[in-house]
Curated annotation (Swiss-Prot):
Gene Ontology CC entries for this record: checkpoint clamp complex; cytoplasm; nucleoplasm; nucleus
UniProt keyword Hydrolase, yes or no: yes
Descriptive protein name: Cell cycle checkpoint control protein RAD9A
Gene giving rise to this polypeptide: Rad9a
Function, as annotated: Component of the 9-1-1 cell-cycle checkpoint response complex that plays a major role in DNA repair. The 9-1-1 complex is recruited to DNA lesion upon damage by the RAD17-replication factor C (RFC) clamp loader complex. Acts then as a sliding clamp platform on DNA for several proteins involved in long-patch base excision repair (LP-BER).
Native source species: Mus musculus
EC number annotated for this UniProt entry: 3.1.11.2
Sufficient for interaction with ABL1: region residues: 266-389
Length: 389
């Protein structure tokens, strides 16, 4: 494989790599007849991104040498990102970029031709790999939003950098709402600040979604996508369904196509505070192998099996984690077998997902009979024998 990129397209390629670096730690490079594909996926398989650069994007493009099969490789994202670390320098000094991949060499060669005849050559180690492909279909999503990326990029500027997730929904008057999502804690006494941005439907080229629908997804990957789309001055299309189904972001142009697929949080309860205030969720990009055991399964005398079954129930019903995280392991300490205080023994109405310890108390309290300790000392059934007599 050999391709040559010139002019401003070098910066476009660098911007794409920066967007991909916000998702995964590995870059999958695959030359195709339709163009050069750059893909990545995060470690939890809850976010996937793909850029396909058409042959017209390059001044020269050769997917494979005559008589040779198409090659594909996997590279460390940090290594490839180092080539385009400073986009300002790339824009000012780099005139063209040549990327070559050969089966007879053990390196991916990226050569930057700079001003004044300076050449920078990067030999990047790679591994052979299978093709990375996510299964998704934007046409299957009933809801669609299409707007210039600048509109959404300006909207997310109001959110703090430390914010993990954002909720996108349709409010009253068909206004698009972006709201910061904070997972509620059972023992939280102070409410965190909530930021909400409202955008009128006149700023959208297409808006096909009913009022009240809302999905929550990770903001970090969304920022990276908006950064690329805004710099390329391209519109962004959002395909989404009900909470729990992935949201698909697409960018289409004659020179490139981009697809970002992000997992959304699943609603466990009905929303009562509007379309953009979802209740606790759990990610569903991966099929869960565990299922909620029947109550009869808890009557086993084997305490290990009992704990495993209970832990599975707590993981399925009490998960309220982010798309890229999972429920922390359940502690098997002996003091968790029964409530240790009056607050734990009495069930209370708590908004949000109760912590795992609360679930342990409720599950055991519903299966095991409560143990009441007598108020006074235990009665003496037999007195101590007199050792001297």
């Amino acid at each position: 494989m050999k391709c040559l990129i010139t002019g401003g397209n070098v910066k476009v390629l660098g911007k794409a790599v920066h967007s991909l670096s916000r998702i995964g730690d590995e870059l999958y490079l695959e030359p195709l007849k339709d163009g050069l594909s750059l893909r990545t996926v995060n470690s939890s398989r809850s976010a996937y991104a793909c850029f396909l650069f058409a042959p017209l994007f390059f001044q020269q493009y050769q997917a494979a040498s005559p008589g040779q099969d198409l090659l594909r490789c996997k590279i460390l994202m940090k290594a490839f990102l180092s080539v385009f670390r400073s986009l300002a320098i790339v824009e000012k000094s780099v005139e063209k970029c040549c990327i070559s991949l050969s089966g007879s060499h053990s390196h991916l060669v990226v050569q930057l031709h700079c001003k004044y005849g300076v050449k920078k050559t990067h030999n990047l180690s790679f591994q052979d790999c299978e093709s990375l492909q996510a299964v998704f279909d934007p046409a299957s999503c009933p809801h669609l939003l299409r707007t210039p990326a600048r509109v959404l990029a300006e909207a997310v500027l109001s959110f703090p950098l430390a914010l993990t997730e954002v909720t996108l929904g349709i409010g009253r008057g068909r206004r698009v709402i972006l709201r910061s999502y904070q997972e509620e804690e059972a023992d939280s006494t102070s409410k965190a600040m909530v930021t909400e941005t409202s955008i009128g439907d006149e700023d959208f080229q297409q808006l096909h979604a009913p009022e009240g629908i809302a999905v929550t997804f990770c903001l970090k990957e969304f920022r990276g996508l908006l950064s690329f789309a805004e710099s390329a001055n391209l519109p962004l299309t959002i395909h989404f369904d009900v909470p729990g189904r992935p949201v698909i972001f697409t960018i289409e142009d004659s020179l490139l196509d981009a697809h970002f697929v992000l997992a959304t949080l699943l609603e466990q309860d009905s929303c009562s505070q509007g379309p953009c205030s979802p209740k606790p969720h759990q990610p569903v990009p991966q099929k869960q192998a565990h299922s909620t055991p029947h109550l009869d399964d808890f009557t086993s005398d084997d305490i290990d099996c009992y704990m495993i079954a209970m832990e599975t129930t707590g993981g399925n019903e009490g998960s309220g984690a982010q798309p890229s995280t999972s429920l922390p392991p359940v502690s098997l300490a002996s003091h968790d077998l029964a409530p240790t205080s009056e607050e734990e023994a009495e069930p209370s109405t708590v908004p949000g997902t109760p912590p795992p310890k609360k679930f342990r108390s409720l599950f055991f309290g519903s299966i095991l009979a409560p143990v009441h300790s007598p108020q006074g000392p235990n009665p003496v059934l037999a007195e101590d024998s007199d050792g001297e007599g």
